[in-house]
């Protein structure tokens, strides 16, 4: 069994896929992701979908990062949505088909 820690993916699905191909997680492995799955990179949606797939093959502990927190706060009125959009939220929205 291995414990694998991954941080700051930031919407970079190609890099995540390369990493997953390299480490080739098995059902005995534990992966801890440190948040910041979204924003900045071109495929936040793909990153989220890939992590959901990974969770069916091994134990995954996804933690929330500051970018996920900022997105949630902007949706709940805790921070200006423009702050989130300026910090990579635009790329996240585009990955879900919003322009």
Language-model regions, residue ranges each:
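N-terminal active-site segment of His-dependent metallophosphoesterases
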Residues: 1-50
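Active-site neighborhood of divalent metal-dependent phosphoester bond hydrolases
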Residues: 40-99
């Amino acid at each position: 069994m291995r414990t694998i820690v991954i941080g700051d993916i930031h919407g970079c699905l190609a890099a995540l896929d390369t990493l997953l191909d390299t480490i080739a997680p098995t059902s005995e492995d534990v992966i801890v992701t440190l948040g910041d799955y979204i924003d900045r990179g071109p495929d936040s949606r793909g990153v989220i979908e890939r992590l959901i797939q990974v969770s069916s093959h091994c134990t995954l502990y996804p933690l929330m990062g500051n970018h996920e927190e900022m997105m949630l706060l902007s949706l709940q009125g805790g921070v200006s949505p423009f702050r989130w959009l300026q910090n990579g939220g635009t790329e996240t929205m585009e990955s879900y088909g919003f322009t």
